[in-house]
């Protein structure tokens, strides 16, 4: 799932399914109630109008922009993400998808920084040692029992 504030930051999270029960908690954690949100016509967004000022673009009807209502900002980000993955990594592991999303979110969110500012920000965020175990387990909820069962 992904959201982006116009002119602002993108926030991303791997979710199991794009349905109401996964999308709405993601929105609640990341978007203030009463905010304007603009989505496509995916059924998962049908009832978000109760918590947000919701406007929909109907891509199925070839509608892409209606005044200030559009989803071009997040679609631009998904395009950058896909090109970045294909051009840099070619293939990514589903196990590490959240890590890749966070890398590209950092790049997007620091798009107006100079290279020196981006480097300083990255260093300030990484002021502690990370173990290999933590690096490879990020975002995963696998127990030892589950890992053994998969082998």
Name what the model sees in each region.
Residues 1-151:
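Residue-level recognition of single "structural anchor" positions
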């Amino acid at each position: 799932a992904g959201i982006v504030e116009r002119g602002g930051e993108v926030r991303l999270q791997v979710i199991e399914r794009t349905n109401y029960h996964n999308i709405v908690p993601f929105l609640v954690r990341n978007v203030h109630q009463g905010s304007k949100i603009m989505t496509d016509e995916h059924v998962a967004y049908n009832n978000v109008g109760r918590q947000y000022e919701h406007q929909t673009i109907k891509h199925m009807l070839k509608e892409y922009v209606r005044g200030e209502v559009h989803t071009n900002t997040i679609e631009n980000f998904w395009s950058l993400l896909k090109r970045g993955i294909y051009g840099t990594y070619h293939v990514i592991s589903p196990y590490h998808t959240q890590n890749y999303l966070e890398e590209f979110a950092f790049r997007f969110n620091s798009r107006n920084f100079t290279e020196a500012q981006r480097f300083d920000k990255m260093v300030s965020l990484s002021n502690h040692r990370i173990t290999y175990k933590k690096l490879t387990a990020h975002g995963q909820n696998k127990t030892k029992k589950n890992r053994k069962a998969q082998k």
